[in-house]
Amino acid sequence: HSDAVFTDSYTRLLKQMAMRKYLDSILN
């Protein structure tokens, strides 16, 4: 299913963004 692939990649993208914000908050 393309939906499953999209959801998986979207979830991964959100995790990357969240991780980046988390690291930024620690470093700054």
From Swiss-Prot:
SMART domains named among the record's database cross-references: GLUCA (SM00070)
Compartments where located: Secreted
InterPro entries, per the entry: Glucagon_GIP_secretin_VIP (IPR000532)
A GO BP annotation: adenylate cyclase-activating G protein-coupled receptor signaling pathway
Principal location class: secreted
Cellular component terms (Gene Ontology): extracellular region
Domain of life: Eukaryota
Keywords: Amidation, Hormone, Secreted
Recorded GO MF terms: neuropeptide hormone activity; type 1 vasoactive intestinal polypeptide receptor binding
Modification sites for Asparagine amide: N28
Pfam family membership, one: Hormone_2
UniProt similarity note: Belongs to the glucagon family.
Listed name of the protein: Vasoactive intestinal peptide
Organism expressing this protein natively: Didelphis virginiana (North American opossum)
Taxonomic lineage from the root: Eukaryota, Metazoa, Chordata, Craniata, Vertebrata
